[in-house]
Amino acid sequence: MKELVVDLKEKSYSIIIKKGLINELSNEINKVYKGKKIFILTDENVNYHYGDKVKDSLINNGYDVKKIVLKPGEETKSFNTLPKIYNEFLDFKLTRSDLIITLGGGVIGDLGGFAASTFLRGIDFIQVPTSLLAQVDSSVGGKVAVDLDRGKNLVGSFYHPKVVLIDPDVLITLEEKFFKDGMAEVIKYGCIKDKEFFYKLKEFKSKDEVLDNIEDIIYTCCNIKRIVVENDEKDKGERMLLNFGHTLGHAIEAYYNFNKYTHGEAVGIGMYKIIKISEEKGIMPKGCADEIKDILIQYSLPYDIEIENSDEILETISLDKKNINSVLKIVLLESIGQSFLKSTNIEFFK
């Protein structure tokens, strides 16, 4: 078992990483919640493997439990899904002294967390991330949000969980493409903050080797994010470094209506493209783009695409929340493991 504490004064919380944790959630929940009513949000895929198991375990430990099962995929993380969730909360007579559990990947964590933050002005929630992407990234840091038709995460808030409970064993049932999806975010951490970690990832020869080291991998990623979030909770400076690859990545996702590329695939493309553009413009010395390309290929992730309608991509980038007064902050690398923010504008991408 590994444990980290995100130190945010009265909003501090633990991240617990332990194989088999899905079978003993009640023990950890009891440490942070003394009530009896729990509402679980999950999706159809996760529910198939773990939904009833978690619900029955909680009921057997004396909790009054209701579960909502949503369709998997980014389309569910829509503003339009919220009324359905709020109505389920009302039917269950959920109060501010009760608890919500998000059992799923990044979509469920973001959507459920945002619903928790807004219903009755805030109900405590616990993250139980079941995808690699959620375990290493989206479940930590308190960013919760939903998408609008014109882009990702345009309606959201900062709302931290009471605890994050990570069981690496659940990754065994994760679809292969979503395991690769999560590896893109893992690679991102090496790119922006940890050169040694990046090159360690390059040494792994198989998925089995990655899984043999998965607790350490998750811990390293969560620890990097913990440090950044403690220094810049509200995303005004250093935390923006975590968005490496995301400016273009989010635009690619929206351009293809969130159904051609997974989030991680789009971020991988975004990481490579932004460094390649920077090298071509002479902002960075050549070399980093090829290293990123090589590791993306190693993990069977795409690194480049042809955009047929670049105007649509540029329009989406202009809506990016890092675009303030027409000044767009992008994340670049001095070298692998050394990242920095550069102020530019939309012309950078033309």
Curated annotation (Swiss-Prot):
Organism for this UniProt entry: Clostridium botulinum (strain Alaska E43 / Type E3)
Residues that bind Zn(2+): 185, 246, 263
NCBIfam families attached to this UniProt entry: aroB
GO molecular function: 3-dehydroquinate synthase activity; metal ion binding; nucleotide binding
Cofactor: Co(2+); Zn(2+); NAD(+)
Function: Catalyzes the conversion of 3-deoxy-D-arabino-heptulosonate 7-phosphate (DAHP) to dehydroquinate (DHQ).
Statement: the UniProt record of this protein carries the keyword Nucleotidyltransferase: no
Localization of this protein: Cytoplasm
Assigned keywords, A-Z: Amino-acid biosynthesis, Aromatic amino acid biosynthesis, Cobalt, Cytoplasm, Lyase, Metal-binding, NAD, Nucleotide-binding, Zinc
PANTHER family registered for this protein in UniProt: 3-DEHYDROQUINATE SYNTHASE, 3-DEHYDROQUINATE SYNTHASE, CHLOROPLASTIC
GO biological process terms held by the UniProt record: amino acid biosynthetic process; aromatic amino acid family biosynthetic process; chorismate biosynthetic process
Statement: the UniProt record of this protein carries the keyword Zinc: yes
Descriptive protein name: 3-dehydroquinate synthase
E.C. code: 4.2.3.4
Enzyme class, UniProt record, top EC level: lyase
Domain of life: Bacteria
Binding site residues for NAD(+): 106-110, 130-131, 143, 152
Pathway the protein acts in: Metabolic intermediate biosynthesis; chorismate biosynthesis; chorismate from D-erythrose 4-phosphate and phosphoenolpyruvate: step 2/7
Reactions the enzyme catalyzes: 7-phospho-2-dehydro-3-deoxy-D-arabino-heptonate = 3-dehydroquinate + phosphate
Free-text comment on the cofactor: Binds 1 divalent metal cation per subunit. Can use either Co(2+) or Zn(2+).
One Pfam match: DHQ_synthase
